[in-house]
């Protein structure tokens, strides 16, 4: 009989939303404790860990005796507490658009997020009655899955939210020879634990990284209500301008579907990008768009008038000020889950993604708002697929 103890510190590399059902500040508030501080419930962690395992390992994590009776899990997962004293919560707007970028009635909402860069600490305890070495391998797999972003937490995980990196793992094993140490040890001074890297994780995904340079301005707007400031500004996270994964997804899904309809193969757009909002049968997306941070940019202000589209006259009271992001550089990361796809489907999807990337490079598609006045254009500087540089012209010809 022994007890395995792990102390984990991890950082969210992208914004995070785990809700509590409240709508006090936004339509979807994040969960907070009685002191108003965000945390990740242990139930959320345990559920994500369990879901990431295969059937055999799920039985180790949560053993079932029969359909009517369950056995207590040997795993204890604590809440993940944030180490920062305070968090500057942010608000994101969510909206559904049709293929012509027209808003769909009843689908405007906002939600609260925790910005990237927060540190979380939690612990895993395993009560091992039989000294089963598989428990240690199971913890290795879970931690490696977090670090490889195979496990993502919370809301909109396939659209860039909820990714983490492991910063530190400390571990200690207690048994009959040192069980008294369990009552007075310091969890911050555990033995450093070498995170086991699962090579098999890499084979589950196709990873694409696209280096991009803005060709002018970009307008993915969020509203301001502070007096004296711009009415609209480009969306930020942690004081950095970003391109949300939802924006990339919308752009790629529309153009991807255009090419998909030209092919005879029976690949449904829902099998790749997930079911749309009107579908009764929800299908999880197999493609992930990471939120992009913009670097080396300029923020330019403009004062503009709203124009009546019928007679081109100015609209009374329609004067507004906006701030847009210009001439920056960024990187788009796309991850395709290959587990439910055959080799032919993977190759087709890769080719179509490269076609969409080429369309972006050529200016045939644009990102964000105000695209009719030249916003949202990019030049592709480099494309990497599974850490190998590819020539865009050769791949799509």
Show the residue positions of the predicted features.
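Small/polar/charged residue-enriched interaction surfaces, especially the RNA/DNA-contacting tracks
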Residues: 1-397
